[in-house]
Amino acid sequence: MKIEMKNISKSFGTNKVLEAIDLPINSGEVHALMGENGAGKSTLMNILTGLFPASGGEIEIDKEDKTFKNPQEAEGFGISFIHQEMNTWPDLTVLENLFLGREIKNKFGVLDTKAMRKKATFAFEQLGVTIDLDKEIGNLSVGQQQMVEIAKSFLSDLKILIMDEPTAALTERETERLFSVIAGLKAQGVGIIYISHRMEEIFKITDCVTVMRDGLVIDTKKTKETNVDELVRKMVGRSITDYYPQKNAEIREIVFEAENLSTADFKNISFSVRSGEILGFAGLMGAGRTEVMRAIFGIDKLKSGTIKINGKSLTINNPAQAIKAGIGFLTEDRKDEGLVLDFSIKDNITLPSTKDFIHHGLFDDKTATTFVKQLSERLNVKATDEEQMVGSLSGGNQQKVVLAKWIGIAPKVLILDEPTRGVDVGAKREIYQLMNELAERGVPIIMISSDLPEILGVADRIAVMHEGKIAGFLNKKEATQENVMQLATGGK
C-alpha cells in the first residue's frame, strides 16, 4: 500500500493548524514523524484515519482518492493508529478488548468464542509474543497492553500502523521487544509511521524522517542522510548549539540527607544533596529509583531510615507531611499522579498551596490568579489563560504546570522523576534552564532520568542504583555512559 497525503490543510475556526502538507507513506518502511508539541503531527494522522476531515487537499491510496469517515472505517481498510493514551478497557480481558465492537458470531447470532480465540492466538503468533487471553488488561504491563493494541490491528489485515510515542512508558526490555516487532512488521510489508521525540530511536529503527513545525512540513529525507543537530534545528527553527544550558549555580552546604532508607524494594539507601546541586539518579528500570523517591515523599512507607533537611530529622508518613517539610515531587506519570486533567491551570498550580490563599476562611481568588499568572509567565506556559483546562494542553505545557505547582510551595528540596519524558526538544531545554535557575537560587534538586545523555548533561553528580542499592556515585569528571552503565549493570 502506498499513501500520498497531498497539500493537506486544516483550520479550526480561524486558527490554521496545517498548511500545504505533503506526506508519502510506503509499505515496508518505518517513517519517523518529528516536531515539537503543537507542530501538527497528531492532527495530520487524525485526518488520515478519519477522526476529522481536512479543510483542503487530498489523500491517495494506491493512486485512488480516499477519505475515511471515521477511524473504524480506516481500520477496516488496514490503517491503525495506536495513540499514546491507549484505547483499552482495564476491567475486560485481553480477548474481550480485542473483539470489542467486532465480535464474531455464529449463524445463530451467538458469540463464537472459539473462532475469536483462534484469530487472537494467530495475531499474537504473528507478533511473536505470548499473552494470556483471559487476563484482564489492567493486570498487564504497559508493554503488554501495547502488544494487545498492535494485535487488534492484525484483526483487520494491517497495512499501515501509526504509533505515537510508543516507548514513553516502556521498560528497556519492552522497548527492545517493540523494536523487534516493528522489524517483523516491516519485513511483512507493513508501513509504519513512528511519532517520537527520542533521537536515539529515530536513528535506530527508522528509514526516513519528516520534520514538522508550526503546521508545515520543513523537510523529509532518509534517516541515514541527516543527524541530530540538523533535526533539532529544523524542529525548533533555530540552532541549539548547546543542548544542555550552562549551569552557574554555586554548590554550598548540605541541605537534604537520607540515611539508611529501606523498604521491601530497596536497602540502606544513603545520600545527601547540597544547596545549588543537581543530583542525578541513574539505573536500569526496576533498580528502585522511583521507589526511593516515593518513600521520601511519604507515598510508600519506610521500614527504616532517617530523612533530614538542614540537619533536622523529619517524620514523613504521607505527602502532606512531605509538602509541609518543603519537599516537592514531580512524579514520572504526570497525567495520573501529577495533574487533575479536568481542573484548570490555576486549580492545579494552587493545589499544594491552597492554604496560603485562604484569608478569614475564604479563598482569595484574586491573589491566587495573580500568583498563577506570574508562575505561568516565568515558566512560559502556553495557554489562553489560567482558567484553561490542563487536559487540553500539550505534554510540554502540562509538565510546566506540574513544575509550577511545586515551585509555588517554595521547596527546600525538589525531586524530579523523568522531568522531560514525552516532552519536545524546545520544552526540554526550557525545563533544563528552569532547573538551573532553581539551583542558582539554592534549591537542591534530585533528578531521576533514564535518558543517559540527559543525566550526564544536567547533573553535577550521579548516584547509580542496581537492584535496590546504590552501586556508586560519579562526579562530573567520572560520569561517562560507560561508567554509568557499568555500575547500573552490577559491575565495579
Swiss-Prot record:
GO cellular component: a single term: plasma membrane
Q: Could you state a single Gene Ontology molecular function term?
A: ATP binding
Q: List keywords of the entry alphabetically.
A: ATP-binding, Cell membrane, Membrane, Nucleotide-binding, Repeat, Sugar transport, Translocase, Transport
The organism sits in which domain of life?
Bacteria
Q: Which InterPro entries match?
A: AAA+_ATPase, ABC_carbohydrate_import_ATPase, ABC_transporter-like_ATP-bd, ABC_transporter-like_CS, P-loop_NTPase
- Compartment(s) where it occurs, according to its Swiss-Prot or TrEMBL record: Cell membrane
Task: Report residues binding ATP.
Answer: G35, E36, N37, G38, A39, G40, K41, S42
- Predominant subcellular localization, coarse grouping: membrane
| Top-level class of the enzyme under EC nomenclature | translocase
Residues annotated as domain ABC transporter: 3-239, 249-492
Its placement in the membrane is given as:
Peripheral membrane protein
Q: Which reaction does it catalyse?
A: D-ribose(out) + ATP + H2O = D-ribose(in) + ADP + phosphate + H(+)
Supply the EC number(s). Answer: 7.5.2.7
Which family, according to the similarity comment?
Belongs to the ABC transporter superfamily. Ribose importer (TC 3.A.1.2.1) family.
Listed under subunit, the entry gives: The complex is composed of an ATP-binding protein (RbsA), two transmembrane proteins (RbsC) and a solute-binding protein (RbsB).
Q: What does this protein do?
A: Part of the ABC transporter complex RbsABC involved in ribose import. Responsible for energy coupling to the transport system.
Q: What is this protein called?
A: Ribose import ATP-binding protein RbsA
Ranked from the top, the taxonomy reads: Bacteria, Bacillati, Bacillota, Bacilli, Lactobacillales
